[in-house]
Amino acid sequence: MNIAIVCYPTFGGSGVVATELGIALAKLNHQVHFITYKQPVRLDLLNQNIHFHEVTVPEYPLFHYQPYELALSSKLVDSVKKYDIDVLHVHYAIPHAYAGYMAKKMLEEEGIYIPMVTTLHGTDITLVGNHPFYKPAVTFSINNSDIVTSVSESLKEDTLRLFDIKKEIEVVPNFIDVSVVKNNFTDCQRGLMATEEERIITHISNFRPVKRIMDVLDIFNTIQKEIPSKLLMVGEGPERLEAEKKAKDLGIKNKVIFFGNSNEIDKILCFSDLFLLPSERESFGLAALEAMINRVPVISSNTGGIPEVNINGVSGFLSE
């Protein structure tokens, strides 16, 4: 098959899962075309089955905000015709499902029918999509998708509760390719991060308020008073600078390492003894799954789709 995948090309869970799905489909000898505004961060290898098509938005002074949706839908139309695309798979409802629908209708005018799968990931529903300015468009886009999937039962329930959805929603959980982490344990150089006596605690996120970054630091501060420990903070976002200041104010600056964004998540997790995920809201919690595959127990909040991933008393513990 010729498959077009539309996603955000960033370090967030939706972009990571979309990229990993495309890579897996390419290994099955499908032709996979990623269509977005820059090459996805996890897409570090293009080959005869994986293609990237950049969406460019020309600057025009009349527009206060450049119309990415129009550029994306036009790019989709061109790609479907040029590469004989069989199916569109759009990840994250805003604006991808809406742009996908526009592309479908333009193609129908030329007698071309292209099915569209929309995968809902979380904040596209619970935060951004639920805003009154976007809600009608999100509802319309979901209802006019051919197939709709959600990454968790919790997100499916939220979608049906918040929107007037007529389409059936199938739950397809996020996944990780276990084969890519199998050698990390023998290559792990834990001594670079901490002494033998110290425990290593890790947090990975986009450093937004919903991730409760300040609580991560408070939790670690309590732990390090009882147990010699280091905290690894992986990611970038609006609370990064504030988190660095708080670590300094708490007097734990020398015990906290800020990595920024990284494509070497597995190599960082192999150092870790514990993974913290105290999110206020989480539709799945891909970072927790990444920790588990690296044999790291997870302590997380008991919210959203996290209990579907982190099984209390099995893979870690849930906290109220």
Sequence positions of predicted segments:
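Conserved acidic donor-binding segment of nucleotide-sugar-dependent glycosyltransferases
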Residues: 312-313, 317-320
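Short hydrophobic beta-strand element within catalytic cores of glycosyltransferases
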Residues: 297-300, 310
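Carbohydrate-associated surface elements
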Residues: 154, 175
